[in-house]
């Protein structure tokens, strides 16, 4: 069987590796317009903020690896068209050579692309996006310039908040804008996001929330020099747009069933409306166990797993995704937040009737006074069924990075908050309290 | 209704508090021969090893708290007999006053007692056990003596290993004995326990494993001065017996159905063979989801939860325990180990046919070279059903203290190792890798 994979980042790599390792013997062709693969975008802010010196280790696979496994890999090759009826992919190499690859099975792993705010001045020099390695390099080069002092970051989601931290670590003045009233609004309720806002402000990042960018203005050299919002005008030397991503599905969105944001609709086998076409990673929808429905959640962790599922199904073993909870985490200047499932706000937006239980305690036993950070927890649950649909944790302790994985499984398994109260969570003073804050938050649920 | 609770430590307190908070109006009598309550025994080594200065904060409840809630609480009062037929408890106060308390419902929360090795010289001065606060005080006083230099700890389970660390932190020479070939043998397989052995040895603790104590010898003042094993004789100034605990069920073991170690047999409502008698905490059996059967696991975390379950059932709300996995953790000189369910060795001893998948990786993304400890993981699963029945984690990273809670839930929910491979575990370089070591260990399972 011949399998063509368009897109060689996390999802495409996971699909190809699953096929190569578990179902050897298939002919695999991988195509990507980029020159590099497996770039860990979430490492950009760590590198650009000089928490690590170089970007070299932000990759985990390269074309030669796949060539060595017998894969035909075409980098810097742009797919121009897919003929779904005749099962052919048309592409052009860097040197304009025409490529036609027939397929038995096609895998769309084209990921997502940054949303471009359609504002006057959007194409000025000095306005950047942040997804690809090359975009990270461009921003790193800008940060190196002495004259680039004031940086506006538009969008205080994960990417925006992280690159704002990086800019501050590089000694820049940083203005962080968002239309929402807090940072991280899509993953956390205000009571939690405010903790990150305070952390950002304490570290000298200027917050401009509830504020909408209207226009970018240029200096004489055509470089962005001002950002105009619905509230004021600010002098800036650089703008980084981080208002979000959308599915990069143009190649197929007119032929295959798509979600409201253009993402390719798939079932739990990652199969699209065309049985010979699979879609994986950020280009595809995904089943949310919190929502109990398909939705769109662009995360590298989902990309990897969806690739594994597609690889098995294409390889011949029927395997359903167990669905996801949108588990995520962020660490800014040592302040950590993790969440999974839906926030109260997100749940209400989706019409779910929910309640929540909040609690705050020290991570470790109260009698340990050193290195014992406080932890805020919120458990969100359906009021009637009491099924857990979300959890948020915030602390300087890293242990919350493990505990959120338990909540992710609890949502997947449709556990109620009352069942969670009885879950066997171990106790050792070095790590937690006899009445673990997760147990107490669950016990306290009205 | 009148409810008598015998034993006022974690399980008894949880039962009483559940009744008081959720089902007010019952008459509650609490009886305990001890003068203190709610002592966190797992804090003893932390206090005696001077990681904290004083024991004052190792308690979370006192008799007056319960008196204020209308409870009749009799401390330093020893129950001599229970007349199950006539539902009466006979006890004697410190001043030898006779107490008779009739009950509608009785709760046995008498905990566990240290196993005393029946060896010549077992009653010599300078031979200690470690369960109660008073026993912690006695050991602390011994550690303060200049002349007490060489300390033998018999039994390298959790309590023995922790008090060995404490003795070393107090500058003592420490000899740690165990009949097994490693420390922590009941919770960890050798490949994992060896990591703790190396850690103990590196910190100067003399390990004597695969060695059985035979006799204790005394000096002229009747103080223990030598320990004789099946291999050699050792001069010591103090012996701390930590060979384990057994259910403290003498008051009822001849009248109620008991487990092979004398623990009171209970169902998932914590009800004993006598419908008016409940048993909670270390005196009772408990349902193990790993084993899919009742067994005996003496842990404070189980004690708390079993008390909550009993309180609800007595109060009138039918509630089944969700069972436990025996989740546990230990941290010795900053080396952390957590486990849940059964080790390979424990599973095989119980006749289960199991396989396991091991993996080792850094906790955080590979490109973070600071504060990024390696983590060893073992997932144990039934060979045929591939149901996960155990997990072991070892690292200097504290994040394993959260991750083990996910495995505890996975065992409770009978997840297979293949389902675990697809679980939504988030990725952020600050906390983990794109291919999380838990995902990889599950993917690698043969």
Swiss-Prot record, chains A, B:
InterPro entries: FAD-bd_OxRdtase, FAD/NAD-bd_sf, FAD/NAD-binding_dom, FAD/NAD-linked_Rdtase_dimer_sf, Pyr_nucl-diS_OxRdtase_dimer
Active site residues of this protein: 10, 42
EC number from the UniProt entry: 1.6.3.4
Cofactor: how bound: Binds 1 FAD per subunit.
Ligand binding (FAD): 7-11, 32, 42, 79, 109-112, 131, 158, 282, 299-301, 427
Residues found modified as Cysteine sulfinic acid (-SO2H): 42
Annotated keywords: FAD, Flavoprotein, NAD, Oxidation, Oxidoreductase, Redox-active center
GO molecular function: NADH dehydrogenase (ubiquinone) activity
Necessary cofactors: FAD
Top EC class for this record: oxidoreductase
Binding-site residues for NAD(+), renumbered to this chain: 159, 178, 187, 244, 298, 329
Annotated control of activity: Inhibited by hydrogen peroxide, sulfhydryl reagents and quinine, but not by EDTA.
pH profile: Optimum pH is 6.0-9.0. Below pH 6.0 the enzyme is reversibly inactivated, above pH 10.0 the enzyme is irreversibly inactivated.
Residue runs in coiled coils: none
Stated role: Catalyzes the four-electron reduction of molecular oxygen to water. Active on beta-NADH, but not on alpha-NADH, beta-NADPH or alpha-NADPH. Under aerobic conditions, oxygen acts as the electron acceptor. Under anaerobic conditions, DCIP and MB can replace oxygen as the electron acceptor.
Stated family: Belongs to the class-III pyridine nucleotide-disulfide oxidoreductase family.
Complex and partners: Homodimer.
Name of the protein this chain belongs to: NADH oxidase
């Amino acid at each position: 069987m011949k399998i063509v994979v368009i897109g060689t980042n996390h999802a495409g790599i996971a699909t190809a590796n699953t096929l190569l390792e578990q179902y050897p013997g298939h002919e695999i062709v991988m195509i990507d317009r980029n020159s590099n693969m497996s770039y860990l975008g979430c490492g950009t802010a760590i590198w650009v903020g000089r928490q690590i010196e170089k970007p070299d280790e932000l990759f985990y696979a390269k074309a030669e690896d796949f060539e060595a496994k017998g894969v035909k890999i075409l980098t810097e090759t742009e797919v121009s068209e897919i003929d779904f009826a005749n099962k052919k992919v048309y592409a052009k190499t860097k040197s304009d050579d025409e490529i036609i690859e027939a397929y038995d099975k096609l895998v769309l792993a084209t990921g997502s692309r940054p949303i471009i705010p359609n504002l006057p001045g959007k194409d000025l020099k000095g306005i950047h996006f942040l997804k690809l390695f090359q975009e990270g390099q461009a921003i790193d080069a800008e940060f190196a310039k002495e004259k680039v002092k004031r940086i506006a970051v538009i969008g205080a989601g994960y990417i925006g908040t992280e690159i704002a931290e990086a800019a501050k670590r590089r000694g820049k003045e940083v203005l962080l804008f968002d239309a929402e009233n807090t940072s991280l609004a899509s993953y956390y309720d205000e009571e939690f996001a405010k903790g990150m806002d305070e952390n950002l402000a304490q570290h000298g990042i200027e917050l401009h929330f509830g504020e909408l960018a209207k226009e970018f203005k240029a200096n004489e050299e055509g470089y962005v020099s001002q950002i105009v919002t619905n509230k004021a005008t600010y002098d800036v030397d650089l703008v980084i747009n981080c208002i979000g991503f959308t599915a990069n599905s143009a190649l197929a969105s007119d032929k295959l069933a798509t979600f409201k944001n253009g993402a390719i609709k798939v079932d739990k086998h990652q199969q699209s409306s065309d049985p010979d076409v699979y879609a994986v990673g950020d280009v595809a929808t995904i089943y949310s166990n919190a929502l109990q429905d398909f939705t769109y959640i662009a995360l590298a962790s989902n990309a990897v797993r969806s690739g594994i599922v597609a690889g098995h199904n294409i390889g011949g073993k029927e395997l359903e995704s167990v669905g996801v909870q949108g588990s995520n985490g962020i660490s800014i200047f040592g302040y950590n937040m993790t969440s999974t499932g839906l926030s109260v706000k997100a749940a209400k937006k989706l019409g779910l009737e929910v309640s929540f239980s909040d609690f705050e305690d020290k991570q470790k036993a109260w009698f340990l006074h050193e290195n014992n950070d406080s932890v805020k927890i919120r458990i969100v649950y359906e009021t009637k069924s009491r099924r857990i649909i979300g959890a948020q944790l915030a602390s300087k302790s890293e242990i919350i990075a493990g505990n959120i994985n338990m909540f992710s499984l609890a949502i997947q398994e449709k556990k109620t908050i009352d069942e969670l109260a009885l879950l066997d969570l171990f106790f050792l003073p070095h790590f937690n309290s006899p009445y673990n804050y997760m147990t107490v938050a669950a016990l306290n649920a009205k």
